[in-house]
Amino acid sequence: MIDKSGETQAAVRIGVDIGGTKIAAGIVADSDPTTVIEYRRRPTPTTNVIDEVAGIIQELIDASPVAVSTIGIGAPGVIDPIAGEVVSSGPTMQGWAGTKIADTLRGQFPLPIAVHNDVRVMGLGESVYGAGHDFDNVLFVSLGTGVGGALVRDGELVASPHFTAGELRCLWGRLPDGSAALLESFASGPGLASCYNAHAENPAVDLHEIMSRYHAGEEYARDVIEEHLFACGVAIGGFISAIDVDAVIVGGGVGTIGDAIINPFARGVRDGAIPPINEVPVIQAQLGNHAPIVGAAYLGKTQG
């Protein structure tokens, strides 16, 4: 790739992360694939989402010192990565299902374009360049406003006939009282807050406040966090026993809080998995807030 000065430069790629509340995108160079060298962020509009995405992509193309080689996109919902289309979606983005992301953007940008689910893309980046880079078979677990996941084998997302491989939010776990519940209802940020407030003398506004109480030594906060993350880990331990992986990487806003989350989760994984997979490493994600963009850029490089 040659820049305007005539010197050869590493290829650059655009990674886009479409979310329910924001669209983030950036330029990533092959020479330094974990660094975002140009960054844009916009609120997600209620309509014409792809028009907003196209505008951001054009801004990045204009800002790039060399020609952009590929575009990779992570988007919410079940995504058909072959067609680059939204197969189904939740209530966060009304009317999103059926959106032909790749075809629409190819009409404006004559570049290779790849699209996949946003959490899968984040897990891909983390598996290739982050905490999972030493492992061939990775389960990425995202604990944030929801619960999601990705299965990565040999540097690629596992393909599946209905495009849901790695989806974790519909897994069930066993709560401390013996009842069963969806992981998302008790291991996501809102889920943990709901579990805490169910029996709290002084309800908390959100998980951030609960963690402040945890670190201040409140026993009830500690019990809620440890018991529910342990329960989540047990469920994931059973899941990895069925699919077999080399490592479990934990990311997302909750998953990257630190040892208070990772340690009970890892104990649960060891308790719920059968030997010898109960000894696989459980590692906190490393790439930070730009993981979705890094992963999307890599998706574009390999699948675009």
Regions found by a protein language model. Give the residues of each.
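ATP-binding/phosphotransfer module of carbohydrate and carboxylate kinases, centering on a glycine-rich
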Residues: M1-T70, D80-E85, L105-I113, G125-N137, ...
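Active-site glycine-centered loops adjacent to acidic/histidine catalytic or metal-binding residues
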Residues: D17, D118, G144
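Short secondary-structure boundary segments
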Residues: A75, L143-T145, A247, G252-G253
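A charged helix-plus-loop insertion that forms the helical arch/lid used to bind
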Residues: E85-A97
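Short loop/edge segments at beta-strand edges and connector loops
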Residues: V115-V119, G123
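Structural signature of FAD isoalloxazine-binding scaffolds in flavoprotein oxidoreductases
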Residues: T164-L168
